Amino acid sequence: MSTAILAPGSRGRRLSKRLLQVVITLFGLLLLTFTIGRVMPIDPVLAIVGPDADQSTYQQVYQQLGFDKSLTTQFGIYFVNLLHGDLGNALLTGKPVVDDIIRVFPATMELATMAIIVGAGLGIPLGVLAAARRNSVSDYVVRIISLAGYSTPIFWVGMMGLLVFYAWLGWVGGAVRVDLGLDGVVPRRTGLITVDALLAGNGQVFWNAINHLILPASLLGFHSLAYISRMTRSFMLAQLSQEFIITARVKGLTERQVIWNHAFRNILVQLLTVVALAYGALLEGAVLIETVFSWPGFGSYLTGSLLLGDMNAVMGCVLLVGVIFVMLNLLSDMLYQFFDPRTKS
């Protein structure tokens, strides 16, 4: 067994190469993020001391932050601090950036998780339907939905969603995670309000959080629905043109069996990759939705940091998004190699 793992072309060797690529990619991302943070036309020293500070105060803070050193030296210091889990302090809160990210990220994760459930739960069946009924009314409707999801600005969708479903109809909660009277009622354990409410056995907070989560998650999931349905349709059309599908139909299998038991089963591995990457994109795309819904998550934190010129926080956020994308990509590759029998040969 060990010989097979070490053999050229084996899954073990491919995984080792992939891990090496991940390390190189993350280092390149770190270097790029640091460089952009230093060349952007934003003065973090001025953001700290304020516009009314005198030159001596400005120069003192400038030296304390290490900006008087070369870029190479600054990057070395930043890299060493990063290895120790230190991303610096945030101007917005005065706390370590790592602590801030740990505090705000669960809110975004909860939103993105619900959004991917909506996007994949609707996008996959719609994509299968469109492929099974190619060039029919159903196919055209699904393609129009997909196009609308790609082209409609998410900020506008969020504003219209709040106006219609909250202000006019009153079907969902407003632009917060829970009602103000229920905020802080359950102890924070995971940062995910729905999970914390379940752990505390508080059904009122749980359903209130769901009521506030439905609208932003559905609107955010609409964009992933467009991508997932389009990719599912493409994968299914490729499978339905294969000879084994024709053979299955000749043998008398029902169309339902052909679609779900043969064609759809063969695209599951590809869909894993699509859904994983869509989930990573949702974590990034949550910035605008969180702004509209006053959602105290990662996106709102990043927006506030950008407006303040807080480069420590911005670089930490950008680095985290990059790490998430790289790790999700690696995970999808590992799942692909594990489940796809063609990678075993």
Located regions from the model:
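Residue-level signal for discrete positions within transmembrane alpha-helices
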Residues: V22, V104, T108, I144-S151, ...
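An internal, D/E-rich "acidic patch" concept
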Residues: M1-R11, L46, D68-I124
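Short loop segments and helix-boundary regions at transmembrane helix junctions
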Residues: L129-T152, V157, V164-W168
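Hydrophobic alpha-helical transmembrane segments of membrane transport/permease proteins
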Residues: L26-G76, F165-V205
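Charged, compositionally biased N-terminal leader segments and the immediate start
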Residues: I5-I36
